[in-house]
Amino acid sequence: MTSSGKIRIYELSKDLSLDNKDVLDAARKLAIAAKSHSSSISTLEANQIKDFLKKSKTINSTSKSSNKLDKQILSVKKNPVKTQKDQKTEPKKKNHDQTELSQAKLNTLLKPSQTLIKNQDSSQANNQKALKNKFPAQQQITAPSKPNKPLPPNPRVEVKPTISKPLTQAESTIPQSEQKKDGQFINQPKRSELAKKPTGQPQQINPQEPKRPLAPPSRPKIDIQDKKPLQPNNQKAKTRINQGEISPQKVGQGNIQKIKSQNKQNQPSRTPQPPTKGNTLELVGAPIRREKPVNKPHTNEVRNKPVMPSRPGAPKPPAAANRQGLSNRPGSNNKIGGTGRPGSQNRQGPNRGGVANRTTQGQNRPGGNNRAGAPVRSGSPNRGGIQNRPGVPTRSLGGPNRSNNRPGVPSGMRKPVAPSELMQLQKPQARPNAPQRKTDSPTSPRPKRENSTGARPPVNRPTPAAPKKPAHRPGGTAAAPRRTGRPDWDDSAKLDALRNKSPQKQRQKVHIIGENDDALTAERGGFAGEQQAVVLSASLARPSKPKVGKRNNGKPLTALKKRKKETTRQRQRRRAMELRAAREAKLVRPEMIVVPEDNLTVQELADMLSVESSEIIKSLFFKGITATVTQSLDLATIETVAEEFGVPVLQDDVEEAAKKTVEMIEEGDLKYLIRRPPVVTVMGHVDHGKTSLLDAIRKSRVAAGEAGGITQHIGAYQIETEHDGSTKKLTFLDTPGHEAFTAMRARGTRVTDVAILVVAADDGVRPQTLEAISHARAAKVPIVVAINKIDKEGSSPDRVKQELSEQDLLSEEWGGDVVMVPVSAIKSENIDKLLEMVLLVTEVEDLQANPDRLAKGTVIEAHLDKAKGPVATLLVQNGTLKSGDVVAAGPVLGKVRAMVDENGSRIKEAGPSCPVEALGFSEVPTAGDEFEVYPDEKAARAVVGERATDARAARLAQQMASRRVSLSSMSGQASEGELKELNIILKADAQGSLEAILGSLEQLPKDEVQVRVLLSAPGEITETDIDLAAASGAVIVGFNTSMASGAKRAADANGVDVRDYEVIYKLLEDIQLAMEGLLEPEMIEEALGVAEVRAIFSIGKSAVAGCYVTNGKIQRNCRARVKRGKQIVFEGDLDSLKRNKDDVKDVSTGFECGIGCDRFANWEEGDQIEAFKLVTQRRKLTN
């Protein structure tokens, strides 16, 4: 009890010695809230539950005692027990009476349904008492207490459980009070009792045990639910027995014969035969097989399961309950291979998995012997009533109802029926006693069995209609001669066994009903109206085609589907082969391929070689290179792959970028050509004075304002000079001399008319000088050499001429055709002479253009201005550019809003050879692209759309340049560990600057650290760039650009490192230092001192060396290397260092000390101890 005065359910159940479940059930009935055994209830509620449970116990004990009293009173009338020998001779009489009662029960089916309910109990009692006196031996055996009770079925609402009581032989020998107890069978076990019994350990049965005759003779539990009550004459007999008017012996002999004769009058296909005692004894006598008497272990459990009250229409019990050999059905007791006829004791059918002893159940069902397709056996009784009526449904064990004797249905073949639809149709009468059949029925005779106890005349059957398809037998009709020795419906049993073996197959076929089921409805007209309605609905629900037809139709469909799938695969393979063959036929290998810029992606190389990209990837894989279709290949790898396919590779010349690709003058312009100013490009090595020379020409100070004193853009200027008494215009392009600006120099050369090569007199020819020479030659422009810095000490113009002559640039003074002018940009010496020479060279070139047409030219430089937007430096090469013109520069569309000259003055139009800055582009155009003016925007958009694809491909190639795969640098470090990467977001002021920086980054060593440029674009640094850097862990590098509003605050909030540079030298240097910082530091040795061992002191197991420091100093806990001669005998930590028995940190040169190492004690005099320490050193990037 709880502290609050309440009591828990489990405590109450413990006090009452009951289960918690019983107490909870009582609480629920009394509406007391108790959810589980731990629920608490008050003391008042506990008392209510106690009173309720006491009343329930009193009621139960009273009903049990009354039932027990009735049982005892009725059992007084039982006859003495027969001996085992008498029991074995009894089957003939028992079988006879079973036949009579089976015939009598059939006639009750033809009565209205009201009679069924009223007369059931009386007819059962009548038959029970009649058989009790007829078989006294069995009465005595079945007298013992009620051990094994079958599982009761689920109750139905429409019929009470007591109405449809099965009338079997075992129950006919038991009084009514013994058979029923509170509406339930005495011998019927509860579910809990059945669950407790292990199925694998049943009892062994022998003939003397009292449970043996309890086995019902006719059907398992499936048949019991279909039992029909007897006719009213049996009810009267039962009433008279209960009233004591007649004795059970009279009912057993007289009334059964009356019932048998009455039922024979109702048989549709036979003339009734007067039942005589002699005939009954002769025909009912069943042969007793004793060939293989075996007691099966599971006999009791299976035999008692059929004794279960079922009601018409009740749900069918599962078939597995009775499929353990079906040996315990009535009439098939302990006989292996027996046919299970009523009256044959100690027989048990063989256990077949899933088939459940078809021969036994076929013989044991009422009417089973005489249906179409079943054999007529001499040793089995001829059953009357329902045995030979066409259309009477019979059931296989646990399977669906089948009508086996309908006209037109093949013999030996059962058609499955939906269990829920035709439950009312199948009412096989499993009465133990059925009247004998008339021997003159038109059925074929069946041979006698060897062990038959009496001679039996051949039994004839009515000839059924010819089946539509002879199933499993050579003989197609039921009237064909039966085979001797083996029932010819075994084939049907095998078929049903296959159907019942798998429940899924049974459910799939359960709704397939033959088209002849309508005959069943017509012949079973005696059913009640609700039963006819069920038949009608089942008839309407069935498919129109017979089962055989559906089966035949299903097979071709399945085969067709298989063929279709195979055809689809074959078709796909065939099409793939055809496409491959067509592709190979169309593809023709080129004679050679030209590789631009020394790299191609895998897909581009596959397109050039006219092969599949997978072939390229496979070839690379066999060489140890794992590549994708978008990765770039270097020239060496491309040559190796191309050689496999037999195609030579030609390297695209470096000067290709400097060639003039577009002719600015068209045929329509020839009539309107006038002379135009020349475009002069100043080229040379860095710091050789190009911008200073232009300043001297322009008489301005541009070089002084440049960051770091170097040019990082193309500067376009137009000047006027006096020549031959007239003013001439010259357009100068100043290109960067740094090695990173190769693309800029190439673009400047492509649009130029004359190239001025500036060479410093004190430095001579340098790498960028050679590059400028190659660019000028590729553009096929004349070269004028300006030897600068002649005013400096140590200058040697002749040495410069000598070096240039080695590059095939021979001075006019030395007999060549190249003009060389010594100048001094600082002192403005010989500037006029240089300009005069340039004008003379351009006059020879005869430069012309048409100013009266739409402008065409080249984008020299482009950048994104924070205030103005995209700004492009345009060089007009033909025509005249005006404000408002629609311009298409590569894939970029724009409309000129304003134009500014080199001095910042706004102009409205620009003629040939005039450089201007134009505003109004939708985005920053690419430097080096040609621009053209179109008459309207529609025509310009059409051209821009076509160029967009090429531009995207170019950008992709640029982005994939960092992922280039080569044979020489194959990322072998990837196998050792993950390759370190430095992520960079690059923003610059102009497109040319981006190209220069990206080109320089490509030159950095990438063996251990890879530089990944996530984004490179001209313009200012925005918040979007900050977010990208924060998400990817990148560093933002700005070159001559600024940060947008809010970008600085976002960078501080996200912790993004933003670096801004004005000189490309510093930018590249910092990026290289950052890459080196990602490298693992290396450890190097730093020598400390040397000591010599002069004495050895043993201390326990170890030893200490007495040393003299000869060089440097010895420190405690440093690393020590012990050398004996030239051999190193030990290297490890120096653990102890003492001087005069005191621990010291270090000992300097000239002092003695004691040195001890924990891991070394094998000292010898003369050993040298080298002391050193390991320090980390930053690694450098190496190629």
UniProtKB/Swiss-Prot annotation:
What are the tr-type G domain coordinates in residue numbering? 675-847
What are the UniProt keywords, alphabetically?
Answer: Cytoplasm, GTP-binding, Initiation factor, Nucleotide-binding, Protein biosynthesis
Q: Compositionally biased, Low complexity: which spans? A: 253-267
Specify one Pfam family.
Answer: GTP_EFTU
Q: Which segments show compositional bias classed as Polar residues? A: 100-143, 165-177, 231-252, 324-349, 357-367
What are the binding positions for GTP in this chain? 684-691, 734-738, 788-791
A GO molecular function assigned to this protein is: translation initiation factor activity
Predominant cellular place of this UniProt entry's protein? cytoplasm
Is the keyword Cytoplasm in the record? yes
Question: What are the record's GO terms for cellular component?
Answer: cytosol
The record's region (G4) falls at 788-791
Localization per Swiss-Prot or TrEMBL: Cytoplasm
| Region described as G3 | 734-737
Which InterPro entries does the record cross-reference, listed alphabetically? EF-G-like_DII, IF2_II, IF2_N, P-loop_NTPase, Small_GTP-bd, T_Tr_GTP-bd_dom, TF_IF2_bacterial-like, TIF_IF2
| Region listing for G1, in residue ranges | 684-691
**What segments bear the compositional bias annotation Basic and acidic residues?**
83-99, 220-229, 288-304, 485-499
The record's region (G5) falls at 824-826
Region (G2), start-end ranges: 709-713
Q: Where is the composition biased (Basic residues)?
A: 544-553, 560-574
Please list where the region (Disordered) is annotated.
Answer: 55-512, 538-574
CDD domains linked: IF2_eIF5B, IF2_mtIF2_II, mtIF2_IVc
Q: Which family does it belong to?
A: Belongs to the TRAFAC class translation factor GTPase superfamily. Classic translation factor GTPase family. IF-2 subfamily.
Q: What does this protein do?
A: One of the essential components for the initiation of protein synthesis. Protects formylmethionyl-tRNA from spontaneous hydrolysis and promotes its binding to the 30S ribosomal subunits. Also involved in the hydrolysis of GTP during the formation of the 70S ribosomal complex.
Protein name per UniProt: Translation initiation factor IF-2
